[in-house]
Design a protein with these regions (language model features):
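Fe-S-dependent hydro-lyases/dehydratases of central metabolism
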Residues: 2-506
Length: 506
């Protein structure tokens, strides 16, 4: 694992802001002074009403205040965010500079190749190639190269990892060279976990700091990533989303990302989930509702009393699914649960103190007395109305109540595939002593960042495996099983709970 990001400050060059709204101030957290660009002072100095903005737009506004240079970010750009409140939308384009970039190995290798090529060009021109480095910090997590060769045994994970190293030796050697050759570039090795889970548990800090000539500046953690599910970290109040490789490389080299000031759809949550209802059931319900509402190209921000009954892992599961419900991101504001999670995942005390102090000073902290922000429009879900669900047969937004699964399958077999007459057909498998038919489960995989990020559903899977074994149940010979924990933390708590053995047995 790379050196801890908890000790790491951003090192990219930061031009002094023009600070047209005279809002640079100082706060103290855990006895340490930090400079920051105060939204409250900016409101007092001309940006009227910005305290009513959605939390996600406040993060964008702070980004503009901090990077105001008169060229890529102007005072009029900043005013446009405040003017968003008039119609709750805008056609103004702004320049967003994320604090960092997250990559995985499939999309990250070309970026490292480009950096290496630029170094070669610099050397050919007689310059110092060591000057070619990412300006924004980059974390590349190797997680997209594993293939399931072995399955259904306790040795499957190690066998698959060994084969992964064997197949990708040249790529991994190249990435290891890049980690040593470039500043601001780190590589998380294979077998550590899924990039979004590693980001949530380890890399993200919610509030970042950077040494500046005049002191240490504190600001919201933001990022772009080369995977659509980068949005998962919005559950930890870190604004971020997936972009293409070219945009990611531009951000890596210090260039801003152009974007329209987005519409923000507020999603009010009330009540609490009933016993037996999982985060997966919730996220399928949310996805169905947002797909129906139409949120493509928009921010979604969650608010309401129901957040108090939603652990951060459940929030991350919902945020992870933003590509499926079509939004740019699904953002959760900082609150007590955020701080609890940062502490549970071993972020340092001074960092947690800074997150709370900064969020409260900026009006980015949500509690029971926080007024609802202004949104473009809103939706509402009572969590107690969520029921056990599955999705399919093709799309995650096609939610099916579990009680209706059999009828839904029969309908899909007829209307979507025209095979109602084959509903009871069984076909012998050559060389095997079993047959297959429509509706048979042939793959049982717990591998996605959406599922493996959530302890409640992972523990539920382990308990289900234990109960199945105790009743003498076994996996059918035609089912290919696989389990890829989202991080080493997941592996550890399954082992500590004694559930890994039960899962391995299946």
């Amino acid at each position: 694992m790379p050196s801890s990001p908890k000790e790491r400050s951003l090192t990219a060059a930061l031009e002094p802001s023009l600070d047209s709204f005279k809002c640079r101030r100082t706060l103290k957290a855990d006895g340490v002074a930090y400079d920051y660009f105060s939204l409250k002072e900016a409101e007092a100095n001309g940006l009227q009403g910005i305290s009513s903005l959605p939390f996600s737009l406040k993060v964008l506004l702070e980004n503009l205040l901090r990077h105001e240079d008169g060229r890529t970010v102007t005072a009029d750009d900043i005013r446009a965010v405040a003017l968003w409140l008039r119609e709750r939308k805008s056609d103004r384009e702004i320049a967003f500079r994320p604090a960092r970039v997250l990559m995985q190995d499939f999309t990250g290798v070309p970026a490292v190749v480009d950096l290496a090529a630029m170094r070669d060009a610099m050397a050919a021109l007689g310059g110092d190639p060591r000057k070619i480095n990412p300006l924004a910090p980059v974390d590349l997590v190797i997680d997209h190269s594993v293939m399931v060769d072995a399955f259904g045994s306790g040795q499957a994970f190690q066998i698959n990892v060994d084969k992964e190293y064997e197949r990708n030796r040249e790529r991994y050697a190249f990435l290891r060279w890049g980690a040593g050759a470039f500043d601001n570039f780190r590589v998380v090795p294979p077998g550590t976990g899924i990039c979004h889970q590693v980001n949530l548990e380890y890399l993200a800090q919610t509030v970042w700091t950077k040494e500046n000539g005049a002191g240490t500046i504190a600001f919201p953690d933001t990022l772009v990533g080369t995977d659509s599910h980068t949005t998962m970290v919005n559950g930890l109040s870190v604004l971020g989303w997936g972009v293409g490789g070219i945009e990611a490389e531009a951000a890596m080299l210090g260039q801003p990302i152009s974007m329209l000031i987005p519409e923000v759809v507020g999603f009010r949550l009330t009540g609490a989930l009933k016993d037996g209802v999982t985060a997966t059931d919730l996220v399928l319900t949310v996805t169905e509702m947002l797909r129906r509402a139409g949120v493509v190209g928009k921010f979604v921000e969650f608010f309401g009393s129901g957040l108090g009954h939603l652990p951060l892992e459940d929030r991350a599961t919902i945020a992870n699914m933003a590509p499926e419900y079509g939004a740019t991101c699904g953002f959760f504001p900082i609150d007590e649960e955020t701080l609890t999670y940062l502490e549970a995942t071993a972020r340092k005390r001074n960092r947690i103190a800074l997150v709370e102090a900064y969020a409260r000073a900026q009006g980015l902290y949500r509690d029971g007395d926080t007024p609802d922000p202004a949104f473009t429009n809103t939706l509402h879900l009572d969590l107690s109305d969520v029921e056990p669900s599955i999705a399919g047969p093709k799309r995650p937004q096609d939610r099916v109540p579990l009680a209706h699964a059999a009828a839904s399958f029969a309908e899909a077999l007829d209307k979507e595939y025209g095979k109602a007459a084959e509903a009871n057909l069984r076909v012998p498998v050559k060389g095997k002593n079993f047959d297959l038919g429509h509706g048979d489960v042939v793959i049982a995989a717990i591998t996605s960042c959406t599922n493996t990020s959530n302890p409640s559903v992972m523990v539920a899977a382990g308990l289900l495996a234990r109960n199945a074994l105790q009743r003498g149940l076994r996996v059918k010979p035609w089912v290919k099983t696989s389990l890829a924990p989202g991080s080493q933390v997941v592996t550890d708590y399954l082992a500590e709970a004694g559930l890994q053995t039960d899962l391995d047995a299946l």
